[in-house]
């Protein structure tokens, strides 16, 4: 069993939940609601500040969320959670990341890429960022960036259908390093190769990044096979740390 989380404080989250309720067979049992192999949780407060203690009866969790972008990028995104940096302004804890969910996060993004045929939205990963704290593997699926997009029928269908029926593959799992927040080179490699992505360490987190945090990203990317590194989008000292860790742990190192 998996968990699907929506927040009443997030308009995009509730729009996606409404699409789910209108288009899928929701089962109820003793006050609990289920769709396929997901249990549905609806919380009152904003999910990024709502630390999750769900127990060990679930395989992973997906949070339905809005995406905000100062650049007004219209997007459908998937990303891991946690903070590599020294601040936690958007939930979670400083320098603390959750266990990622590479098979199903990648499967969800792969399905969105396959099913979305429009031109309005950019379908992409985001780097690991924001809370909450989770006690099981998890990822976010987001629609950005204004109410016009949050209520878009194609966006809701693409996102929710991909969460419920991800194109999940048993490909090798990698930690991605480098590039900007949307990791375009990582995304392009992902689209052309049989690979799953776990944590994504953006170049914006490289100034304060410590070696133990890179090892932590490996440990919190289940069955991690290696690193996928955007060479030009990675600080040289971070490249050196990644190389050293990959050598020490016998991990594959792919430079792009």
UniProtKB/Swiss-Prot annotation:
Cofactor note (record): Binds 2 Zn(2+) ions per subunit.
InterPro entries, per the entry: Deacylase_DtdA_archaea (IPR018033), DtdA (IPR007508)
GO biological process: D-amino acid catabolic process
Reaction(s) this enzyme catalyzes, per UniProt: a D-aminoacyl-tRNA + H2O = a tRNA + a D-alpha-amino acid + H(+); glycyl-tRNA(Ala) + H2O = tRNA(Ala) + glycine + H(+)
Keywords from the UniProt entry: Hydrolase, Metal-binding, Zinc
Enzyme class: hydrolase
A GO molecular function held by the record: zinc ion binding
Matches recorded under Gene3D superfamilies: AF0625-like
Keyword Zinc appears in the UniProt entry: yes
EC number: 3.1.1.96
Cofactor(s) the protein requires to work: Zn(2+)
SUPFAM superfamilies: AF0625-like
Keyword ATP-binding found: no
Role played: D-aminoacyl-tRNA deacylase with broad substrate specificity. By recycling D-aminoacyl-tRNA to D-amino acids and free tRNA molecules, this enzyme counteracts the toxicity associated with the formation of D-aminoacyl-tRNA entities in vivo.
Subunit (UniProt): Monomer.
Family: Belongs to the DtdA deacylase family.
Protein name: D-aminoacyl-tRNA deacylase
């Amino acid at each position: 069993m998996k968990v699907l989380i929506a927040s009443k404080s997030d308009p995009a989250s509730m729009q996606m939940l409404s699409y789910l309720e209108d288009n899928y067979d929701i089962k109820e049992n003793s006050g609990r609601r289920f769709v396929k192999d997901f249990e549905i949780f609806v919380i009152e407060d904003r999910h990024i500040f709502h630390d999750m203690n769900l127990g060990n009866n679930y395989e992973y969790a997906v949070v339905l969320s809005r995406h905000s972008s100062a650049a007004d990028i219209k997007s459908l995104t998937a990303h891991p959670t946690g903070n590599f940096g020294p601040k936690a302004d958007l939930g979670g804890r400083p320098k603390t990341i959750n266990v990622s969910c590479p098979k199903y996060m990648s499967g969800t993004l792969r399905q969105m890429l396959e099913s979305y045929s429009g031109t309005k939205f950019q379908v992409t990963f985001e780097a690991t960022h924001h809370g909450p704290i989770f006690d099981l593997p998890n990822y976010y699926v987001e629609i950005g960036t204004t109410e016009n997009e949050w209520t878009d029928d194609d966006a809701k269908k693409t996102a929710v259908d991909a969460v419920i029926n991800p194109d999940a593959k048993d490909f090798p799992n990698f930690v991605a390093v480098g590039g900007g927040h949307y990791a375009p080179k990582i995304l392009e490699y992902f689209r052309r190769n049989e690979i799953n992505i776990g944590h994504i360490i953006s170049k914006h987190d490289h100034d304060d990044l410590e070696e133990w945090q890179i090892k932590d990203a490996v440990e919190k990317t289940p069955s991690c096979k290696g690193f996928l590194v955007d060479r030009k989008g990675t600080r040289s000292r971070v490249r050196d740390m990644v190389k050293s860790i990959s050598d020490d742990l016998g991990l594959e190192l792919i430079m792009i």
